[in-house]
Regions:
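Short, conserved catalytic or interaction motifs in soluble domains
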Residues: 40, 81, 144
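Conserved hydrophobic/aromatic beta-strand scaffold that supports enzyme active sites
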Residues: 27-29, 118
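A short glycine-enriched loop-to-beta-strand structural element that forms part of the catalytic core
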Residues: 70-81, 106-139, 148-156
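Catalytic-core segments of nucleotide cyclases and related cyclic-nucleotide turnover enzymes
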Residues: 7, 11, 15, 86-97, ...
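Short catalytic/binding micro-motifs of nucleotide second-messenger systems
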Residues: 60-65, 96-109, 141-143
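Conserved long alpha-helical elements within nucleotide-processing catalytic cores of c-di-GMP signaling
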Residues: 2-26, 33-59, 69-73, 87-90, ...
Length: 158
């Protein structure tokens, strides 16, 4: 696996952000959908390559003050800008999904889908685990997750 930033790195980055003004950012929980099936069909080597490629394409796509960390297997956390203009934010999330789905690697092009939970960071800062938990709950409890190739949902504090 390539040198991917991990959860410990993201915790430090998140805590730095909390010291300033975290408003205008969101915490994103992202999982590659049907990863276990992909891994069984194509083997662990291709599964590892997929994990790396998703990380690479998102890391290149994100703005310079946004970040991604590989947590484990097919699970990533991101810190991204969050606009008050929902239409603009939705377009950005759709574009992010497109970056994953249409990555310029023939073996995966058009076949990789994701589920995302988005937790807008509140004015009153929450700790890393609370932000992660809220984004995870949002992703896991999204009513569209079983009906869509890719999905995302936005929740506030639970």
């Amino acid at each position: 696996m390539t040198d991917m930033r991990n959860e410990e790195w993201l915790i430090n980055k998140y805590n730095e952000l909390r010291k300033t003004d975290a408003r205008g950012y969101c915490f994103v929980s992202l999982k590659i959908k049907r990863f276990r099936i992909f891994n069984r069909l194509y083997g662990r080597e291709m599964g590892d390559l997929l994990i790396n490629k998703v990380y690479e394409v998102l890391d290149e796509w994100l703005d310079h003050d946004e970040c991604i960390a590989h947590i484990h297997l097919n699970y990533y956390n991101l810190i991204m800008h969050y606009q008050d203009d929902y239409d603009e934010f939705f377009r950005r999330m759709i574009a992010m999904n497109r970056v994953i789905r249409d990555m310029p690697f023939e073996a995966f092009h058009g076949q990789i889908f994701s589920g995302m939970g988005i937790f807008p960071l509140p004015a009153e800062p929450v700790d890393f685990r609370t932000a992660q938990y809220n984004a995870d709950i949002c992703r896991a409890e999204c009513p569209q997750s079983v009906f869509r190739n890719s999905h995302f949902e936005i929740y506030g504090v639970t």
